[in-house]
Amino acid sequence: LLTPLLKAMPQKIDEDMVIKLAKDMCSALELCRKHGIIHRDIKPQNIMLLKSGIIKVTDFGIAKLPNTETVTMTDKAIGTVYYISPEQASGRLIDPRSDLYSLGAMLYEMVTGQLPFYAESSVSVVLMQVNDDPVPPRELNPSLPRGLEQIILCAMEKDPEYRYQNA
């Protein structure tokens, strides 16, 4: 899983590794999109990094599959609060751009060593996901290339219309 890699790093993951992981994740998410699948729980614990360097997306347990209309369970948002998209956190309709938001949150953590939003309660984190902008990554990691920061912030736009439209 990617989680041990994040925990093993003193602060942040090497930018070349982040870029490679981002490209591989985008390929995986694009394949999901082409098959009509929305993962809905993209987070480090659901990404396997094989010894060969290949990544595998795991845990499609709450994925939205093609031709299913339910996007929430009993009107509750599902997913992991630290990586959940604002629309998913609000119980609104989601599409593949929700997974891109989650990927952006993961990348943010990789390059800064911090979650984009953190609070003691899950409810507070959800409210931050919906209402607050993250601290710009370069404020936490000044050596981060501006282009990579822009990619992360675009993926984490609150409004899906302003995010990347596909992986």
List where the protein language model places each region.
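Activation-loop N-terminal segment of eukaryotic-like protein kinases
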Residues: 49-53
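Conserved activation segment of eukaryotic-like protein kinases, specifically the C-terminal portion
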Residues: 74-84
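C-terminal lobe helix-coil module of Hanks-type protein kinase domains
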Residues: 82-167
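Protein kinase catalytic-loop region centered on the HRD/HxD motif
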Residues: 27-37
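Pre-DFG segment of protein kinase catalytic domains
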Residues: 56-59
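Activation segment signature within eukaryotic-like protein kinase domains
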Residues: 21-22
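AlphaC helix of the protein kinase catalytic domain
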Residues: 1-13
